[in-house]
Amino acid sequence: MEGLKELGLMKGNAEDAVREGAHALFYPHGLGHMMGLDVHDMENLGELWVGYDGQPKSTQFGRKSQRLAIPLEPGFVHTVEPGIYFIPELIDLWKGEKKFMDFINYDKVEEYRNFGGIRNEEDYLITETGARRLGKKIPLTPEEVEALR
């Protein structure tokens, strides 16, 4: 949220914006999901059964796509997928409804409408003492990406 504010895409109190769901214009899904032998096989077992264990699931746009609400345990494998998306149809819908005008700077969003989006995906094994990344570190900064040439 703070990065979106720095770019001028969002404004106002970050906690209020997230609580209301304004951030979902740029990130309309959950942060990641459990993995089994295949990337999505755990959710195919039944998202509520695997990731919620009787806990209530949010109905808020964006948050309702979160696939895990149970505490992480050693041995779990989880993907973490932060990103940012500019979906023209969603921008038009929310802007037309004047949705979250206190939090979203739609004039600035228009400058990015044709960008598309980008997502970073990394997979982690939950251990007794924390988490271990599976695979190599993905380059994130412009300098790290340029160094791949």
What function would you assign to each model-found segment?
Residues M1-R149:
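Active-site neighborhoods and metal-handling regions in enzymes and metal-associated proteins
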